[in-house]
Amino acid sequence: MFNDIPVFDYEDIQLIPNKCIITSRSQADTSVTLGKYQFKLPVIPANMQTIIDETIAEQLAKEGYFYIMHRFDEDSRKPFIKRMHEQGLIASISVGVKAYEYEFVTSLKEDTPEFITIDIAHGHANSVIDMIKHIKTELPETFVIAGNVGTPEAVRELENAGADATKVGIGPGKVCITKVKTGFGTGGWQLAALRWCAKAARKPIIADGGIRTHGDIAKSIRFGASMVMIGSLFAGHIESPGKTVEVNGETFKEYYGSASAYQKGEHKNVEGKKILLPTKGHLSDTLTEMQQDLQSSISYAGGKDLDSLRHVDYVIVKNSIWNGDSI
């Protein structure tokens, strides 16, 4: 019965250190393999309009990071694939499940992307299963990521349909209000949901949403994630596509959810909101800091690579690790 499983989130967990076996954190290897490719970090900037654009996707691919391009500029997807392939870079795009997307997928046979993410808010759906099967029939070599889901049943069904990885997380993100608008989701127990889903998974899981600190990346890996998708920590950079807004002499960047009125351009089925984040430095600096913090996590885990994080003990700290402090 579900109510018997422990329910917790990132701030309720502390990982327990092991004896360190490396002399410098720079010896810790943060690389991860997804499909046929190796990437520098197990981290993916969220495929949202205020997080990633074609320029950032190109920069990430050149530097050895994984990326997923958003699906909200549909006509530019084929030229984007061409541009990436001309530079010898991987193409990783998103699709929805509407009827015209089937034709679009079939048209990719001439220039096939290495990765396609089926990206809808409630991914445990016949429409997603049908699209997975269609992609796998038309583009058998393409690595298919499907989501988003929040239960082991959903993970199994999408894997059985042919998904190569599933994305876990329904509404735990900072600008996602699914949990408030619908009463459903993994907000407040995303880490427990990840653990629950990972136990059923035979293929990689991508934890998506609810990441507030770099330490949460290590916690996600401990509870079964192969990769971690992050929105708010990647928003607000100088290069971020979000609009720059000045308030009382300070500069901010817009950050909004993928199902928000701002993204949809109209007021319907809204499950996202818009916030302003203080402008921070360059994206490359954040990625470097994330890598260094993850290397420190590996050193605390007593290992040399990400696998060591999967085996550490943990405690559930019910008064929250912040103890009244805010991040």
Curated annotation (Swiss-Prot):
Residue positions binding NADP(+): 205-228
This protein's UniProt keywords: NADP, Oxidoreductase
Keyword Protease in record: no
CDD domains noted in UniProt: IMPDH
Enzyme Commission identifier(s): 1.7.1.7
GO process terms (BP): purine nucleotide metabolic process
Superkingdom classification of source: Bacteria
GO molecular function: GMP reductase activity
PROSITE patterns according to UniProt: IMP_DH_GMP_RED
Family: Belongs to the IMPDH/GMPR family. GuaC type 2 subfamily.
HAMAP family membership: GMP_reduct_type2
PANTHER family in the cross-refs: GMP REDUCTASE
Protein name: GMP reductase
Originating organism: Streptococcus pyogenes serotype M4 (strain MGAS10750)
